[in-house]
Every structure is written in C-alpha cells, then in structure tokens.
C-alpha cells in the first residue's frame, strides 16, 4: 500500500517517474480467463504460484518453477518477484530516481553517492517488479516496484517499517499472516492500465498464495501543515477510522490529532473525491484509517496509516483478482 516504506501518493506527473497509485475502482479485467496454478517446490520458498494474467498475449514466463511465487506476463511486460541481487539493486535505483530526483526528498547519508534508496529491510523482504523487456534484459527493464514485508521478514529485523511512525502492536497481534506494503513506484510513461493491472494482479497472487489476512502501510497527504489538511484529516477520522481491535495509533511523540473540524460541517462526497488517488483507491477497496497522522518533514508529507483486512476487500476486487481464475472472464 502501501512509496519508500509506505504506500505513497506522491508523483502525479505523466512525464516523470511517479509513485504507484491503485486505481480509483478495482480494474475491469480484460477478455480471457485468468489461471492460478500452484506448484510445490523444495527450494527456499515452500510453494509457488504461476499466474497467467487475463491480458492480451498473456503467457507463463520462462522462469524456473521454484522462483514462481508471482509470474505474470502480458506482451513485453512482466510482473514477478525479484530473484537476484541485481533485481533488488534495480528496484533501489528506480526508487532513488522517484523519491529523491523527482519528488525532492532529502537523501539519507550515502544515498546520493550510491544513487540508491536502500535500507535494512531490502535484504529480508520480497520485491515485486514490473519489467518491460523491450528496454532490455537487465536493470534497465525494471519500470515498477513494490516492497512486500511479511511477519517472517519483519521478525528478522525486529519490527515492521511502519513501526517508526505507528504503534502496530494490534496489527502484529492480528490472527493469520499480515503484509506490509511500501516503497512503491512506477517509472515514467508506465502508468497505463496494463501496468497497473499487472501490479495489482501480482499483489493479489501474492496475497492469496501466502493466505494474507491483513494488509497495511502508510499513505501520504501532500504538505506538512496539519491545519491546512484539516478537511481530509477530519473526514478520514470520522468516516473511516478502524474499529478498536484493529486501530493502530501514531506514536505519542509523533501523534497529530486528526479531529480538527466539526464533522457536521464536512461534505463527505466532496471530500472523498478530493483525496489523493492512493488513499481514495484504498478506501474504495474497503480500507480503514489508523488514529493519528504523522508529519514527515523529509518527504514533505503528512502520513496516515492504511489497514485493509482481506475479509473486508471489496468483492469486485476479489472477483477480478481472486484465486478462482476460471470465473474471471470478462
């Protein structure tokens, strides 16, 4: 959900690298059935999924089955998980271009010299990649990325990334597997529908393969003045606050109260329409909002926490991307 360690809304320019935003509605599947085929392996990953997307020209990629947790091909485009250190490096290079060169974030020490956006989570998580094979077969082919952190990966580090801003104890206690989405971005000229469908098909295949029960991550409102964001913050609190058992709260030292206006004075329809596409898209999928916002001065944003139980997913999304592929024909 989930840019950088978050699902971000930054980057709406069509002529520059941009952060990935989910569509405002679950995408309508193209003609043709989607298939999900489970393959058991003896490699590091206990099982894998090979997904043939319901897109024109879709076919299984020529990747060894042991690496196929996600592998979807449509024409020259492919979405799969990173398999090598070179794949991860390519994702880090793309993230640097988006977050620091385009969005103007302040690089951490060493990032500017290396021209890479890196942190300690990169070697433990899964990286979802979109590749355009017309650009080549190496790092230059990577045009989109999304970072996926499950319990096992977070345990090796000691915490989820969002724990730097929020008390995620209630999320960690959630029964079943949980997934933090972040560091999402798409390169210039690749925001057309096929790329977005590939990304969401890849996330869906991953979610169903690992039986994910809960997804979460941070999303951003532009600007660092909470008073200037009183309308969207108040709307999110009064209309989309998570139920108590799921309600993560911003850390005390970073907590910004979202209850800034009388809810009677809000226009829900107009406010929802004006929200950044990322947040609006997740709300339409059935997401909740945590308690409290967090100002991120490094990136010039005010963050909110998105929580999306898979059980609450909009049924149209399930129908489009769920595991029962044979019912996905248009």
Question: What is each residue range found by the language model?
Answer:
Residues 33, 37-85:
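Conserved N-terminal entry element of GNAT/NAT acetyltransferase domains
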Residues 68-143, 147-153:
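Short amphipathic alpha-helix that is part of the acyltransferase structural core
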Residues 125-127, 301-305:
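Short hydrophobic/aromatic beta-strand or adjacent loop that forms the aromatic wall/cage
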Residues 148-288, 293-303, 313:
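Acyl-donor binding region in acyl/amide transferases
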Residues 318:
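Long, contiguous binding/interaction regions
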Residues 324-330:
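Short, cationic low-complexity segments
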